[in-house]
């Protein structure tokens, strides 16, 4: 496919005012100004007609396909609220790719999502990075697992308080995480000793600890649900204790500790910003959080947390960050290349770079202008819009 005559936002360099994007065998083949456009192109050609051409949007944190749209309990598969520690739960076993919200995502230009379990459990389970086009989930997966979800703050407290079980305090929530990480470290060490010495007894198989092995081996990052500043600090404290790779998710009060987060080298997926202050830990929610974090030197992404904010409003969330002071280029990066980098999938998506997946969005105007319309969406070199 050849897409021509548009302002090309490559996200790996400056925009090209009148450019083209060529896709071959599902991958980005060539990008440049129209003067360099292949003259002998034989395949499908799409004229952007002076619009904007950019990589497919990436939602770095949502629950797409985990909470079925308008399905009630039958479609509610995001929280296994029967056990505070469920690292062995895999999003790929819960996502419904037939959920109509996948279509909503595609039509809005959101071509990649990181989706997975909610935040009822301190250790919630495994996220998946996947495309929004397709019917057979295994064919849509980019990376599984993509992250291990941890949760701090009000959600685990409320979940288990209502069940008259623990944890019901922030201390207990942190203790659940620490205890199971410590068990995983011990399990890892026993496996390594058994592998090195035939006389050492191999530990009995444990599905939960097996799932945590990539975490304590620094092969899989943890995504920490945390809104309040003290919960953010607790999450980082635990990760430093166990030497984990981590990303803060939501970080609602991150702007209050922006310099400290920069000092710690934290990465933050901010949002959702389109909603009310529905619980106490959202009291300091602000549209300025992304810009204040970015100004401090924190790498950010912007998410919808679908269904909290419908996934199709990801570009609007980025536009609202611009309203809060974030430069437009940074806001666009936060839903493309930065989101892909934080999500560990930048080798495949997030920019119009030669060799990456042919995921492209064509819009009638600037992508952060809410009046701009999506003209076409291409995933893996195939047009997926009607």
Model-derived features with residue positions:
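A general structural motif
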Residues: 203-205, 224-228, 249-252, 278-287
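C-terminal cap of metal-dependent C-N hydrolases
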Residues: 6-10, 341, 353-386
